[in-house]
């Protein structure tokens, strides 16, 4: 099971969930779950970041919500077609800490030895790019 952020053809943000059965609109599945459980005070969840901030982002949450909604309605109408765009999972991270340069291909590319231990490095939060996003290079 994989969660992802996406926008609809009308640029509305959503959370998607990928299961062996396909990709689904988790934002709408969450709404059905809230209604079924009578969680009227629970917020809508259009962003993965909001799920993280509210401490709802866990495998157990996704499983419980999906299993509950599947028990009373078909998810087929919530299956995603090709009319959506994958977005960055967290749009405004405070920090990006990376783990890398510990595999052979990268070390060879940089003409260096493969480190014995993984290396950590930081990236600017503006370095995130959506799937198939365009990298813009500065002019000049």
PLM segments and residue spans:
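Structural signature of FAD isoalloxazine-binding scaffolds in flavoprotein oxidoreductases
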Residues: 114-131
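A structural-propensity feature for long, helix-poor, extended segments
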Residues: 128-140
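N-terminal non-catalytic cap/leader segment that marks the start of a structured domain
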Residues: 1-118
